[in-house]
């Protein structure tokens, strides 16, 4: 499959996306489904297409994505990161433009773990004076 395809791996929260792009008509498939069908929310679809809009390549590439782990928001962010890396693999001149927009940098924020004796990561038990 890697013949004339360009590849990029994207990660966000606990999601991992493998993105393959090649010159085409602008079709985006995520796990075998059209992007509009896979991501229900319009904001998630917009996040996925952001690097394409920025580089004026909305209908220039066919994109195939395998994504797993996490929820809808994390998966959309992972796909955006993967599309960005695949575009850089296709044309390194796009890197500065994508980097200025902040798409090249991996968002390192993860869920903080729950601690013993607390309700959540930071939420303490209610204090009673008496």
From Swiss-Prot:
Keywords: Ribonucleoprotein, Ribosomal protein. The keyword Ribosomal protein applies. GO terms for molecular function: RNA binding; structural constituent of ribosome. It holds the Pfam family Ribosomal_S9. It comes from the Bacteria. GO terms for cellular component: cytosolic small ribosomal subunit. GO terms for biological process: translation. The keyword Cytoplasm does not apply. Belongs to the universal ribosomal protein uS9 family. This is Small ribosomal subunit protein uS9. It comes from Methylibium petroleiphilum (strain ATCC BAA-1232 / LMG 22953 / PM1). The lineage of its organism: Bacteria, Pseudomonadati, Pseudomonadota, Betaproteobacteria, Burkholderiales.
């Amino acid at each position: 499959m890697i013949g004339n395809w360009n590849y990029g791996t994207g990660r966000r929260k606990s999601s991992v996306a493998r993105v393959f792009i090649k010159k085409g008509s602008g079709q985006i498939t995520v796990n075998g489904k059209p992007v509009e069908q896979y991501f229900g929310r319009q904001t998630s679809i917009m996040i996925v297409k952001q690097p394409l809009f920025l580089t004026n390549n909305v209908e220039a590439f066919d994109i195939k994505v395998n994504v797993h782990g996490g929820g809808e928001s994390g998966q959309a962010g992972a796909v955006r990161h993967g599309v960005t890396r695949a575009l850089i693999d296709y044309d390194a001149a796009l890197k500065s433009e994508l980097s200025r927009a902040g798409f090249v940098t991996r968002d390192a924020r993860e869920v903080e773990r729950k601690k013993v004796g607390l309700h959540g990561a930071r939420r303490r038990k209610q204090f009673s004076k008496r």
